[in-house]
From Swiss-Prot:
UniProt keyword annotations, A-Z: ATP-binding, Cytoplasm, DNA damage, DNA repair, DNA replication, DNA-binding, Nucleotide-binding, SOS response
Organism: Leuconostoc citreum (strain KM20)
Role this protein plays: The RecF protein is involved in DNA metabolism; it is required for DNA replication and normal SOS inducibility. RecF binds preferentially to single-stranded, linear DNA. It also seems to bind ATP.
UniProt-recorded Gene Ontology molecular function terms: ATP binding; single-stranded DNA binding
Entry-linked NCBIfam families: recf (TIGR00611)
GO annotation, cellular component aspect: cytoplasm
Source superkingdom: Bacteria
One GO-annotated biological process of the protein: DNA replication
Stated family: Belongs to the RecF family.
InterPro entries assigned to the protein according to its UniProt record, in alphabetical order: DNA-binding_RecF, DNA-binding_RecF_CS, P-loop_NTPase, RecF/RecN/SMC_N, RecF_2
Protein name: DNA replication and repair protein RecF
UniProt-annotated binding residues for ATP: 30-37
Length: 378
């Protein structure tokens, strides 16, 4: 998979930008606050129809404008497909081959991306919500059914919480509608839990050999999906549904008192264990970074297995956060097989040695130029 071109209109600090990319490594060099991260964010948004930096689409629109458009062309095998996203006060519109998509779940997955940024080093020790979002965004790209189910789960959860709040405030005493919402939550939530368990097992299988190699065979990585519902490890879908329903029934009084749903996939977590120790609690900074690196590299292989093509990789100012050894493992792993976009103030000696014939852009105050050996492009 390859992103051959990108066009931005009124996107953050870019009023009008068109770029053509190398199928190999594309490097964007510049000082901080010049627009490098905005550029990589736009590629991420083009793929997933949402930003990793803000929950408000309005933040993506240039402050002088009322709407923004991101468009690009992706190449799979020998065919090219145009993609575009339009954001305005009326919402977002997604198009594939110039045809508007009725659901975003039909759009997401056309372009698959893996983002590795400094905040991803928080994947191991950050809040559980960081790890849930990681699972949802990465697995959602690979599996449209999972993306649909997690979207439905969030909608039902929002409705159920709103009704629990009404019960808490004694605005209603009728629990029949709560029963309906509970049944819906259990049905979709069990699908989400089962799918997440499968994803975590496959991610572990891909990450373990990478982690062992980066740690020079000194450490073994294990991933544990921690659910807020106490069911047997190898429970099937119907068993998960039954346990989820029983747990919600036991928690109903507490839920009404709190006005919110206290158990379910929205409360689950992912634990990283190295040599039988929780890396978030007992791991050194080096172990935490090795774990995060192994997970990101495993994602690339897993997505290639699932979709039949390698995703594109976005490295946003992350090389400077890795020591020479981890930089080497990362760059060798992606060498000549993954289209990569790198932002950095400057390239390290390791990167210059290992990156073959990169296409280098310089970014300054929202203006982008190619290095002298290329034709200038803005």
């Amino acid at each position: 998979m390859e992103l051959t071109s990108l066009k931005l209109v009124n996107y953050r600090n870019y009023a009008n930008l068109e770029l053509d990319f190398s199928p190999g490594v594309n490097v964007f060099l510049g000082e901080n606050a010049q627009g490098k991260t905005n550029l990589l964010e736009s590629i991420y948004v083009l793929a997933l129809a949402r930003s990793h930096r803000t929950s408000s689409d309005k933040d993506l629109i240039n402050w002088t404008a009322k709407e923004t458009t991101i468009s690009g062309r992706i190449k799979k095998n020998i065919s090219e497909t145009p993609l575009s996203l339009h954001f305005s006060s009326k919402g977002k519109k997604a198009r594939v081959n110039h045809l508007e998509q009725s659901k975003l779940s039909q759009y997401v997955g056309q372009l698959n991306v893996i983002l590795f940024a400094p905040e991803d080093l928080e994947l191991v020790k950050g809040a559980p919500s960081v790890r849930r979002r990681f699972i949802d965004m990465e697995f959602g790209q690979m599996n449209p059914l999972y993306l649909y189910n997690i979207t439905q789960y969030r909608r039902i959860l929002k409705d159920r919480n709103a009704y629990l709040k009404r019960l808490q405030l004694k605005q209603t005493k009728d629990t029949v509608f709560l029963d309906v919402l509970t049944d819906q939550l259990v049905s979709v939530g069990a699908e989400v839990i089962l799918a997440r368990q499968l994803f975590v097992r496959r991610l572990q299988a891909a990450a373990q050999p990478i982690h062992a190699e980066v740690s020079n065979q000194r450490e073994q990585l294990t991933l544990v999906y921690q659910t807020s519902i106490d069911f047997e490890e190898h429970a099937d879908l119907e068993q998960i549904k039954a346990t989820f329903a029983a747990t919600l029934n036991r928690q109903r009084t507490r839920e009404v008192m709190q006005g919110s749903t206290v158990v379910g996939p929205h409360r689950d977590d992912l634990q990283f264990i190295v040599n039988e120790n929780d890396v978030a609690v007992f791991g050194s900074q080096g172990q935490q970074r090795t774990t995060a690196l192994a997970i990101k590299l495993a994602e690339i292989d897993l997505m290639a297995q699932e979709t039949g093509e390698y995703p594109i990789l976005l490295l946003d100012d992350v090389l400077s956060e890795l020591d020479a050894s981890r930089q080497t493992h990362l760059l060798l792993a992606i060498q000549d097989k993954v289209q990569t976009f790198i932002t950095a103030p400057s390239l390290s000696d390791v990167a210059r040695q290992l990156i073959h014939t990169p296409k280098v852009f310089h970014v300054k105050q929202g203006e982008i130029t190619l290095e002298a050996k290329h034709t200038s492009e803005k």
